[in-house]
Amino acid sequence: MASVKEGDYQALKEEIKKIMKQPGYDDGSAGPVLVRLAWHASGNFSLVEHNGGSNGAGMRFPPESVDPANAGLHYAISFLLPLQSANSWISHADLWTLAGVTAIEAMGGPQIPWEPGRLDYESEQAAVEHRGDVSNRLPDGALGAAHIRDVFGRMGFSDQEIVALSGAHNLGRCHADRSGFDGPWVVNPTRFSNQYFKLLLPGTRLMMLPTDMALIEDPSFRPWVEKYAADQNLFFKDFANAFGKLIELGVDRDDTGFARLAKKAAEEGKPLDKTAPPAGDETCPVSGAVGGGVQRAAGGGGCPFMAMQNREAKL
């Protein structure tokens, strides 16, 4: 696996696209499972507990690594491991989320907003100390609308965002040994489109979960299913916004753009000490912004790549 220049995320995305070609895996593509990895790494965030989310890459350690909801994601992690080993300057947490957005784009989907700066837990002990218990927070496909709202509401998503994010079921397939369900949702499970919503409405259905059917049975969800089935551009726009929000969950950035120990910072009610932001005459190789001028989705901040030169990207 190729090593790319430190901070060259575009080159890294090209390497991720090469990884997506997996003739021996589902439908010959790792794309859908890379999207699922980014989703599950982020989707255990809680606004109440102030923990979980994409920061830390906690799925490398128990109990997240053995959570039944994450069954099969070891394939995605193993596909990315050679690339991470060849480019140790990027954290697992950043690579997992970057791989997810890259896969969506490569499979014909929208461009998802993404920023670097996530850190990795160095050990299981560090993950447990800073992340806490994030089990039983991911959607259960066998349940209905109330469960969906509970899961997504915990992360701060609206009904519209819930339906948009559910459109990720246009990709990949279920496996009986992982979820108890089997088969793809759509005809072409490696191409991102609005076909999932079209198939949800009366017509031919390949395979739908109870959580999928809840989207057309619930009076608040269904109008969005109908809108996205009729307008792929609208779906792409709303999905990009919702997925970009999803992968930022738990990423409490400091003024250098790096993620803080979100739970500890919340408990103490103050930010943690960080290395000073880079000098104002330096240009960020990620965004092209100068010095601390780049603005981030989770708050203002400087360039995380340049700050990385002055600190170790580990929790």
UniProtKB/Swiss-Prot annotation:
Classification via InterPro entries: Ccp1-like, Haem_peroxidase, Haem_peroxidase_sf, Peroxidase_I, Peroxidases_AS
Pfam families noted in UniProt: peroxidase
Region (Disordered): 267-286
Cofactors required: heme b
EC number from the UniProt entry: 1.11.1.-
Gene3D superfamilies: 1.10.520.10, Peroxidase, domain 2
Positions contributing to heme b binding: H169
GO biological process: cellular response to oxidative stress; hydrogen peroxide catabolic process; response to reactive oxygen species
Principal EC category: oxidoreductase
Domain of life: Eukaryota
Disulfide bridge map: none
Note on cofactor: Binds 1 heme b (iron(II)-protoporphyrin IX) group per subunit.
Site-annotated residues for Transition state stabilizer: R36
Annotated keywords: Heme, Iron, Metal-binding, Oxidoreductase, Peroxidase
Active site residues of this protein: H40 (proton acceptor), W185 (tryptophan radical intermediate)
Molecular-function GO term, any one: heme binding
Family: Belongs to the peroxidase family. Cytochrome c peroxidase subfamily.
PANTHER family assigned to the protein according to its UniProt record, in alphabetical order: L-ASCORBATE PEROXIDASE 3, THYLAKOID LUMENAL 29 KDA PROTEIN, CHLOROPLASTIC-RELATED
Reported function: Destroys radicals which are normally produced within the cells and which are toxic to biological systems.
Protein's UniProt name: Putative heme-binding peroxidase
Species of origin: Cryptococcus neoformans var. neoformans serotype D (strain B-3501A)
Biological classification of the source: Eukaryota, Fungi, Dikarya, Basidiomycota, Agaricomycotina
